[in-house]
Amino acid sequence: MALNAPSGSCSSKVLLHPLVIMQMSEHYSRTKVQQGPTVKKVFGAILGRQNGRQVEAINSFVLKMETEEMAEPVTFSTEHLLQRADQYLEVFPELQVIGLYCAGEDDNLTPEEKPLLSKLTNAVRNSEKAGQIDATLFLKLNSITAGTTRKLPLFAFEADVTDQEKHKPIEWILVSEESERVGVNHIAKLSTKHGKDGKSVGKKHAEAQDAAMSMLQNRVDLIVAYLEKVQDGTLQPNFEILKEANLLAQKLKTIDRYAAEFTDSFEKEEKTMTVFSLMPRLTTLLGNMQNVWNKLSAQRADLLADDGFHGKSTSRWAHPVRFKSQHLGRPQQADDDDYFDDEDLENDMSGPRRKIHAADSPAGSRRRRVPPRAMNFLGRNSGMQAATDEMELSGQEENMGSNYIPDVPRPSATAHNESDESSQAS
């Protein structure tokens, strides 16, 4: 609780909440940044309640000024004042307009501020919803000297009931509730020297929890010490404090009654949070598996694309040079050994066993392989016969399936006759 009692103060007192002071300072700083150094003062209305000679200032809002140039006489919009006051009355019926505040660069009430205070008083008294007050309160905050001294440069003035042109200083007392102290403490911790805080979110949360537990422990120790002093006769009993302590003890019994239910609920929540924490990991693992599968599929598609039969043939020699070089690790050679032979395939794929040559089978004499270059050579010499043989081979391959091996094309009789004639001519 802070007290400011200037000389000449009377019996009137003002109970001032921290929210009003914070809003006054924020209003001046924000306007100064937005409009530049030309702004010297800012004005706003104070909301609160009055109980006899005691006035309590709880909240405030900004007034809409008619001009921005402080060199000329300024005034505020009465329509905006009454509209905002009616809106607050709908939400908080106990709050009414009790005065005017000004945040500037001086301490005293200036001649240009007195007409504003008189205008606000007349507007409030003529309105049915804005509220009725005996004397208008005026708060003046010197934002220039704020922070240079330990004393808050805030001054309170009250208009005389008989003469509204006269104002006298009154004392003000800083009061706050438990929720307001927690909020102010939180804002003070977040506000650093350069607007930066190197602490992590987890560390801040842990510190807040530790501070709350420490405060609870201190309050419990204080209550226990007070009860011991009362029991010993050192202190006189205060029935209000004893009543609050009794209510707290009754709440402890309620907590013990629902301890088992609380434990079950806590365990269920813990399991749920554990499952939720595992879901991102499972999603990551599934993504990695999908990437591996995509790579394997791409490799398989690459191997099938290199197949001479476009992946439709499953015979052991229907694989080109690239597949053979990738499988055996041999350099690529564009010669007649472009295909796997039986010996290479059996030694590499099946391990050492008895070698079975194609000639051992009954069809070995007619099912022999000829390299592509030899087939092309015979095709050029035989003319139409080679083309006919290729058409027959393609038809037979479709009928017999992928295990069909084309027969070796044989030279025609015309080719033998031509060779005999050439030998006789020579």
UniProtKB/Swiss-Prot annotation:
<keyword id="KW-0217">Developmental protein</keyword>
<dbReference type="GO" id="GO:0008180">
    <property type="term" value="C:COP9 signalosome"/>
</dbReference>
<dbReference type="InterPro" id="IPR037518">
    <property type="entry name" value="MPN"/>
</dbReference>
<feature type="compositionally biased region" description="Acidic residues">
    <location>
        <begin position="334"/>
        <end position="347"/>
    </location>
</feature>
<dbReference type="GO" id="GO:0005634">
    <property type="term" value="C:nucleus"/>
</dbReference>
<keyword id="KW-0221">Differentiation</keyword>
<dbReference type="InterPro" id="IPR000555">
    <property type="entry name" value="JAMM/MPN+_dom"/>
</dbReference>
<keyword id="KW-0896">Oogenesis</keyword>
<comment type="similarity">
    <text>Belongs to the peptidase M67A family. CSN6 subfamily.</text>
</comment>
<dbReference type="GO" id="GO:0048477">
    <property type="term" value="P:oogenesis"/>
</dbReference>
<dbReference type="GO" id="GO:1905879">
    <property type="term" value="P:regulation of oogenesis"/>
</dbReference>
<comment type="function">
    <text>Component of the COP9 signalosome complex (CSN), a complex involved in various cellular and developmental processes. The CSN complex is an essential regulator of the ubiquitin (Ubl) conjugation pathway by mediating the deneddylation of the cullin subunits of the SCF-type E3 ligase complexes, leading to decrease the Ubl ligase activity of SCF. The CSN complex plays an essential role in embryogenesis and oogenesis and is required to regulate microtubule stability in the early embryo. Mediates mei-3/katanin targeting for degradation at the meiosis to mitosis transition via deneddylation of cul-3.</text>
</comment>
<feature type="region of interest" description="Disordered">
    <location>
        <begin position="320"/>
        <end position="426"/>
    </location>
</feature>
<feature type="domain" description="MPN">
    <location>
        <begin position="14"/>
        <end position="155"/>
    </location>
</feature>
<dbReference type="InterPro" id="IPR024969">
    <property type="entry name" value="EIF3F/CSN6-like_C"/>
</dbReference>
<dbReference type="Pfam" id="PF01398">
    <property type="entry name" value="JAB"/>
</dbReference>
<comment type="subunit">
    <text>Component of the CSN complex, probably composed of csn-1, csn-2, csn-3, csn-4, csn-5, csn-6 and csn-7. Within the complex it probably interacts directly with csn-2 and csn-4. Interacts with rbx-1.</text>
</comment>
<keyword id="KW-0963">Cytoplasm</keyword>
<keyword id="KW-0736">Signalosome</keyword>
<dbReference type="Pfam" id="PF13012">
    <property type="entry name" value="MitMem_reg"/>
</dbReference>
<dbReference type="GO" id="GO:0005737">
    <property type="term" value="C:cytoplasm"/>
</dbReference>
<keyword id="KW-0539">Nucleus</keyword>
<dbReference type="GO" id="GO:0060184">
    <property type="term" value="P:cell cycle switching"/>
</dbReference>
<protein>
    <recommendedName>
        <fullName>COP9 signalosome complex subunit 6</fullName>
    </recommendedName>
</protein>
<dbReference type="GO" id="GO:0008237">
    <property type="term" value="F:metallopeptidase activity"/>
</dbReference>
